[in-house]
């Protein structure tokens, strides 16, 4: 039950003492001076939570050795209960947790929350994904939602940090590098830094205003302009799309992407859910192998 989890979920981490994976006992991620039941400012077990939104919420390592964990936290209202605007479902802020090495252990600090405007995104800021830009800024791209308010435009949202992930600019709709807005459903997405220096974003771009989570197709890969932190319009390439005869509920989402060391391409793990019908939760687990070309992927 997601609503029950929104009052309980917390994060744990584990470390390995060797180059080969040999995990040590896991531990709850808690800011110094806080407790298991109150692990961060404004987080209280039993009332709200801190969690990872999806597999695409990959931690980011900074040049100074710090680790940024792109999490999200449910929000408490003035009455102390879980907050959700009218017509919404769950409601979260993006919440980055910074880990720094001290004495052989990670010391955790919760960054300033990145809060959405419920009048523009009815589920707040969801499932952040991170990348480091050449000028030292950290780029965070986020999922929003117009759930329950389909008249609102469905966008991706973006925020930047200039201090290593502790303070963030107010979120704004993400655009192409030329400033034009694009539509995107409420779905996960991933920023992926390639060893050739390019920065890619993988997610769903919709041809018209989406309705909440739909449509979650086509799935695209796009190159990010690293000067502006915006998408390069000419660098958008389709990975997959709805095929003739497939249900409109098709979901090309909830994936995970990684660079393949052997080929330099990108492997994308995804199950094409609901291709036959909206209630059919059976689907093959697929791996897409993407060959990269300048300006995008083929």
Residue spans for each PLM region:
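Beta-rich carbohydrate-recognition and catalytic domains
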Residues: 1-52, 60-123, 131-183, 195-198, ...
């Amino acid at each position: 039950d997601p609503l029950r989890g929104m009052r309980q979920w917390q994060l744990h981490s584990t470390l390995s003492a060797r180059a080969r994976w040999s995990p040590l006992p896991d531990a709850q991620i808690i800011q110094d001076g806080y407790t298991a039941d109150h692990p961060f400012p404004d987080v209280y077990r039993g009332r709200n939570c801190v969690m990872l939104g999806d597999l695409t919420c990959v931690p980011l390592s900074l040049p100074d050795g710090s680790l940024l964990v792109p999490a999200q936290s449910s929000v408490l209202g003035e009455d102390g209960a879980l907050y959700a605007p009218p017509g919404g479902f769950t409601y979260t802020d993006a919440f980055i947790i910074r880990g720094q090495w001290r004495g052989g252990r990670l010391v955790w600090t919760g960054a300033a929350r990145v809060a959405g405007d419920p009048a523009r995104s009815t589920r707040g800021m969801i499932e952040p994904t991170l990348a480091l830009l050449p000028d030292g800024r950290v780029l965070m791209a986020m999922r929003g939602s117009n759930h329950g308010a389909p008249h609102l435009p469905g966008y991706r949202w973006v925020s930047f940090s200039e201090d290593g992930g502790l303070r963030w600019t107010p979120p704004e709709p993400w655009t192409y590098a030329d400033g034009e807005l694009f539509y995107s459903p409420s779905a996960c997405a991933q920023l992926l830094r390639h060893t050739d220096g390019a920065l890619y974003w993988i997610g769903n771009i919709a041809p018209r205003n989406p309705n909440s989570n739909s449509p979650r197709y086509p799935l695209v890969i796009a190159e990010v302009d690293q000067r502006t932190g915006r998408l390069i319009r000419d660098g958008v390439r389709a990975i997959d799309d709805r095929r003739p005869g497939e249900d409109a509920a098709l979901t090309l989402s909830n994936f995970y992407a990684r660079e393949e060391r052997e080929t330099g391409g990108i492997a994308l793990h995804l199950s094409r859910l609901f291709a036959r019908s909206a209630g059919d939760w059976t689907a093959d687990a697929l791996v897409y192998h993407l060959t990269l070309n300048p300006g995008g992927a083929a």
